[in-house]
From Swiss-Prot:
It is found in: Cytoplasm. This is Tyrosine recombinase XerC. Belongs to the 'phage' integrase family. XerC subfamily. The active site is at R157, K181, H250, R253, H276, Y285. The gene is xerC. It comes from Vibrio vulnificus (strain YJ016). One of its GO terms (cellular component) is cytoplasm. Forms a cyclic heterotetrameric complex composed of two molecules of XerC and two molecules of XerD. Residues 118-298 form the Tyr recombinase domain. GO terms for biological process: cell division; chromosome segregation; DNA transposition. Disulfide bonds: none annotated.
């Protein structure tokens, strides 16, 4: 944003600012550092409003506030810096409401731009194949490969995977019932190597699981496996299989999404498969049924195409 100019602010802008600074000092008891931060933010915004022809704070509406935020974005300000300025402005407007200068806070409905979170690097298909070439007969190794095949084969969140019960898995139809964010239930297709290795795990699971334990994946103690255990075992397998990238559950989920999208170019289906919340809005305009999702999955997923030749498992 522009720096303060030498042109004095009109009294309609200047006087309320000075009153607010005194309020911060005398009544709020804020530190000098915090007071300076408020003043720096507000002076810059006041100068910009003045340059746009405003002479008093009651002239400011949500549109002007959005212009301030937009100007910051265009000038390359960080999202966190814009959020700080909007926060200062909201506090100032609340003060003006207390003083009867404003009747409503025009910055209340204006959101700062979201901070861009860098996506985790995904594995390429060769790295995934290298990771998943686990052919040990130990029940825990079979379990771990089933977990990784399912995580990559269905794009599940870690919490979704850990919460799966045996009754949620249907091998013959290639469906898993999962509970996603917001306690929302969805059916997820899985196939090929994921079906094969979950089936292998189910054959040896009874040797580890307590008879009353409903969880699909259990620890060596026979109870539902923990999030931390899954993370730890995946990282260990990444090292054991000499995969260069650090292996995490979310990296497998992200790789699933990337590889499906690269193969199908069907962003809408990928969003459905991942269970993203914003799908509920787009479903008003277009609805993809489960069979369509399963078809996209079967055609696009690199390991779904590796069908086991004579897989005849019953539903578990």
């Amino acid at each position: 944003m522009t720096t303060a100019s030498n042109t004095p602010l009109p009294s309609g802008l200047r006087k309320p600012l000075d009153q607010f600074y005194e309020y911060l000092r005398a009544e709020k008891g804020l530190s000098l550092h915090t007071q300076r931060n408020y003043k720096q933010q507000l002076e810059t915004m006041a100068e910009h409003l003045h340059s746009m022809g405003l002479k008093a704070w009651p002239q400011v509406d949500a549109g002007w506030v959005r212009q301030l935020a937009g100007k910051g974005m265009r000038e390359g300000m960080k999202a966190s810096s814009i959020a700080t300025r909007l926060s200062s402005l909201r506090s100032f407007f609340d003060f003006l409401i207390l003083r009867g200068i404003l009747t409503a806070n025009p910055a209340k409905g204006v959101s700062a731009p979201r901070k861009k979170r860098p996506l985790p690097k995904n594995l390429d298909v060769d790295e995934v194949n290298q990771l998943l070439e686990v052919n040990e007969d130990d029940p825990l190794a079979i379990r771990d490969r089933a977990i990784m095949e399912l995580m990559y084969g269905a794009g599940l969140r870690l919490a979704e995977l850990v919460d799966i019960d045996v009754r949620d898995v249907h091998l013959r139809s290639g469906e898993i019932r999962v509970i996603g964010k917001g306690n929302k239930e969805r059916k997820v297709p899985f196939a090929g190597m994921a079906v094969e290795w979950v089936g292998k795990w189910l054959k040896v699971r009874s040797g580890l699981a307590d008879p009353s334990e409903p969880a699909l994946f259990v620890s060596k103690l026979g109870t539902r496996i923990s999030h931390r255990s899954v993370q730890k075992r995946m990282a260990e397998w990444g090292q054991k299989q000499a995969v260069a990238s650090h292996i995490t559950p979310h990296k497998l989920r992200h790789s699933f999404a990337t590889h499906i999208l690269e193969s199908s170019n069907n962003l809408r289906a990928v969003q459905e498969l991942l269970g993203h919340e914003n799908i509920s809005t787009t479903q008003i305009y277009t609805h993809l049924d489960f069979q369509h999702l399963a078809d996209v999955y079967d055609q696009a997923h690199p390991r779904a195409r590796k069908k086991s030749s004579q897989h005849k498992e019953e539903d578990e």
